[in-house]
Amino acid sequence: MRAEIIAVGTEILTGQIVNTNAQFLSEKMAELGIDIYFQTAVGDNEERLLSLLDIASQRSQLVILCGGLGPTEDDLTKQTLAKFLGKSLTVDLLASRKLDRFFASRPQFARTPNNERQAQLVEGSIPLQNLTGLAVGGIVTSKGVQYMVLPGPPSELKPMVMEQVVPILSNNGTKLYSRVLRFFGIGESQLVTILEDIIKNQTDPTIAPYAKVGEVTLRLSTKAENQDEADFKLDSLEKEILALKTLDNRKLKDLLYGYGDNNSMARTVLELLKVQNKTITAAESLTAGLFQSQLAEFSGASQVFNGGFTTYSMEAKSQLLGIPKKKLQEYGVVSHFTAEAMAQQARQLLKADFGIGLTGVAGPDELEGYPAGTVFIGIATPEGVSSIKVSIGGKSRSDVRHISTLHAFDLVRRALLKI
């Protein structure tokens, strides 16, 4: 089904409010297998809204109008839609009774004729009762096009959509099912390059890449009658994707760290540690506790994480971790030696299975001759200690710190999975 959203309200065009309803509705319609082709905002003007309705009626099967259902003269959505369709306005009995109760319980408010506008419906509409407000919504069909009228305030629109609109539109047949694959260690441009043939020939399912700070996600989407049918199609596409290799011959499946919109590298590592009954600690310099903070963000972190160290200065590294100051001066705080020593000392001091050491140059200035974005990450395990050097150039100080923690978590992930 082709659909479009028309947001009615001059306050949207003047930037006084943000049109969050469009994002919410687009997401919900997509879940129902309804394709939003257009989004438009129009002011509180009858002539312009009539013009837009004329355009929408010729290109869409479902037209969703948000806003303009209030009691004032500039709330003209239902009135304009009725005029466009050549229909009259009727009063919805339930909405009218709600107005009665509202004003009966608030004698300090005067009820005026304008208030009755909130209980009006376009003739022939299926009413959508407003659970958190006074203005009734509705769905009316004319010449093969459905018109849905919804209130503007999100606190009124969202309950109406979730509790009334979704059940009505769920009979549409197919729904949209999605699966999000999360990758670390490859950029969006390279991922799109190696997926070029698949993307070029895609029909259903489809692939949508998204670049995030330090990682890339792929959203696989398909329309299906049920979850089993969707899983069959998505499993096949995922298998085809993960069989590929990067331009430098790494297995793409090894760069996949998790699934879902709300997942993260920290959550993935936490769950792996819990499953394997392992513990972890960290000593951080440039990240200043960010690694530990991300780990502790999730419930159950205390099962695998007892604490750690933030050792920003050379003195702190020496005093708290017991790393000889002469060695730090010899090798420098930005070095493989220091990253490994931090990881090893932290692991031994807190008797953890894994220790992480993070040191480097967050920026913007150089340190010890290294440019901003130079990071050394050490990992200590029962099998030994090692480290990597990462160059995160052209990023803000905040991004350097965040991406550094992703690399650290990935080291732990690979160690746990023995990749």
Curated annotation (Swiss-Prot):
It comes from the Bacteria. Coiled coil: none annotated. InterPro entries: CinA, CinA-like_C, CinA_C, CinA_KH, Competence-induced_CinA, MoaB/Mog-like_dom_sf, MoaB/Mog_dom. CDD domains: cinA. Belongs to the CinA family. PANTHER family: NICOTINAMIDE-NUCLEOTIDE AMIDOHYDROLASE PNCC, NMN AMIDOHYDROLASE-LIKE PROTEIN YFAY. This is Putative competence-damage inducible protein. The lineage of its organism: Bacteria, Bacillati, Bacillota, Bacilli, Lactobacillales. The gene is cinA.
